[in-house]
Amino acid sequence: MADQRMDISSTISDFMSPGATDLLSSPLGTSGMDCNRKRKGSSTDYQESMDTDKDDPHGRLEYTEHQGRIKNAREAHSQIEKRRRDKMNSFIDELASLVPTCNAMSRKLDKLTVLRMAVQHMKTLRGATNPYTEANYKPTFLSDDELKHLILRAADGFLFVVGCDRGKILFVSESVFKILNYSQNDLIGQSLFDYLHPKDIAKVKEQLSSSDTAPRERLIDAKTGLPVKTDITPGPSRLCSGARRSFFCRMKCNRPSVKVEDKDFPSTCSKKKADRKSFCTIHSTGYLKSWPPTKMGLDEDNEPDNEGCNLSCLVAIGRLHSHVVPQPVNGEIRVKSMEYVSRHAIDGKFVFVDQRATAILAYLPQELLGTSCYEYFHQDDIGHLAECHRQVLQTREKITTNCYKFKIKDGSFITLRSRWFSFMNPWTKEVEYIVSTNTVVLANVLEGGDPTFPQLTASPHSMDSMLPSGEGGPKRTHPTVPGIPGGTRAGAGKIGRMIAEEVMEIHRIRGSSPSSCGSSPLNITSTPPPDASSPGGKKILNGGTPDIPSSGLPPGQAQENPGYPYSDSSSILGENPHIGIDMIDNDQGSSSPSNDEAAMAVIMSLLEADAGLGGPVDFSDLPWPL
């Protein structure tokens, strides 16, 4: 046992000896020792370098400069980014002000919304929301030749294609011979500017400008500065609104040469006229279109400008514009007549006047508003115009007046002719106003007559009888002297009010009396007027109700009444001056509610029509109590 213990202790001591320890730790611990050594060395070196930099003033300065450069670079970058953001914001704001949809918004929009609305607006302008390509314009069942013949036949012209860069005629249809007398072979390949009038070349060049079409994008090499040839496949041609063209130009006509002698052109002016006749005016309508050079067969032009760009051409239809100049009759030039529009109330007062009236009448619109048109009519034309006034209130048709004289601001008269029509409120069924289109009639039209305006038959009655002798005086005609005030009737503004009250009374009676529903406004009933000796007739006539002549009353039926203050026998109620009293006298025995209502309507209308213009109305002799 002791020997075994000694062997074990010797073995352990051998194992724990330094040599054995090196043998065990050599394969495993060598790398770890080296790593620790490296770590210690690296950290030591860094610390030493830091201590050296701190101790060395030169190293400390370099370190400070390095940190300053980093800080300055960061600040410069932030300033650049800030300026870029400011520019972008300013452009976004400017774009928002140019787009109508953005400008109409009350709140400020974000950048994405502004850009989206700008894109939508550009698509709307260029027609890109619903693009029209070549295939959309041609039906599938028509070939190209058939479509070309149909277009030429419908347009009655010739089709031509012109290059926008040089004005070279690339194609022209055979129908050009009918208009310009040039064959197709004579024009193809020639310059369009050689056949234009010298004064029209600049205008045609402006129309050939392709700035509105798709931009010609080119890639430029930064080193050489030359354009780079790209293989970009062009998309389908789009007919945008900016590519449309329509213009007039003068082109040469190849008319057959005629031998002209010198005596035929005695002056330079005649030669200029002959040269002018060799041109004809052509109306060209078409659009600008872009083709790749390979499609046009222009690859032989190996110019650097043609690389990577499309060829813009004008495709148009040329039609002969005929000069239609009417020949003057009797050496006079017919011009459009001057006219103005006015709107009147039912009593003839101005409620609206067109601004063109100032150049014709010399009145400002505010000077005419609220005044009656009868104040400006000549006294000889009041009767005819009153009849037209009554007719336009009773019918829905347009009434054309005869030529009449209208007093302008300087006191003289101008000749007018008017078309009147009334506007009826669809809800109340009442006339609200009268629209009058007034046309100036020249002296030559008055002498020769104008078939477009039929003349109406003038009334045999004079409107002098419509006003009392105290206001307008007895009937007499004053000679009209241009430039001197006169010719109008004092107090004529009441005539329109009297006509309006007459028509309103007619409609009121028609609405209240069942027996008169089917009668005409101009002839309420066929009952003859009562005799002037009857009590009712005397009292009503003495009431002084204004009287207006009716256009439908024949002259033979007019009865003079000395007790009536006016010379005409027509009443404010129409042809029958006392329709209400006569109807009541015939039905005295019956007291139906309809008759009572009709009687009260007549009484109320007489009270309203009187309006303080005449004397008091005496109803003491009426056959029934009030």
Curated annotation (Swiss-Prot):
Gene Ontology process terms (BP): circadian regulation of gene expression; circadian rhythm; negative regulation of DNA-templated transcription; negative regulation of fat cell differentiation; negative regulation of nuclear receptor-mediated glucocorticoid signaling pathway; negative regulation of TOR signaling; oxidative stress-induced premature senescence; positive regulation of canonical Wnt signaling pathway
Residue spans of biased composition, Basic and acidic residues class: 51-60
Matching Pfam families: HLH, PAS, PAS_11
A GO-annotated cellular component: PML body
Main location (coarse class): nucleus
Domain named PAC: residues: 401-444
Residue numbers bearing the N6-acetyllysine modification: K538
Site description Interaction with E-box DNA, residues in chain: H77, I80, E81, R85
Positions of crosslink type Glycyl lysine isopeptide (Lys-Gly) (interchain with G-Cter in SUMO2 and SUMO3): K252
Domain spans labelled bHLH: 72-125
Top-rank taxon, per record: Eukaryota
Keyword annotations: Acetylation, Activator, Biological rhythms, Cytoplasm, DNA-binding, Isopeptide bond, Nucleus, Phosphoprotein, Repeat, Transcription, Transcription regulation, Ubl conjugation
Short sequence motif named Nuclear export signal 2, residue ranges: 361-369
Cross-link (Glycyl lysine isopeptide (Lys-Gly) (interchain with G-Cter in SUMO2)): K259
Motif position, Nuclear localization signal: 36-41
Assembly: Component of the circadian clock oscillator which includes the CRY1/2 proteins, CLOCK or NPAS2, BMAL1 or BMAL2, CSNK1D and/or CSNK1E, TIMELESS and the PER1/2/3 proteins. Forms a heterodimer with CLOCK. The CLOCK-BMAL1 heterodimer is required for E-box-dependent transactivation, for CLOCK nuclear translocation and degradation, and, for phosphorylation of both CLOCK and BMAL1. Part of a nuclear complex which also includes RACK1 and PRKCA; RACK1 and PRKCA are recruited to the complex in a circadian manner. Interacts with NPAS2. Interacts with EZH2. Interacts with SUMO3. Interacts with SIRT1.
Function of the molecule: Transcriptional activator which forms a core component of the circadian clock. The circadian clock, an internal time-keeping system, regulates various physiological processes through the generation of approximately 24 hour circadian rhythms in gene expression, which are translated into rhythms in metabolism and behavior. It is derived from the Latin roots 'circa' (about) and 'diem' (day) and acts as an important regulator of a wide array of physiological functions including metabolism, sleep, body temperature, blood pressure, endocrine, immune, cardiovascular, and renal function.
The name this protein goes by in its record: Basic helix-loop-helix ARNT-like protein 1
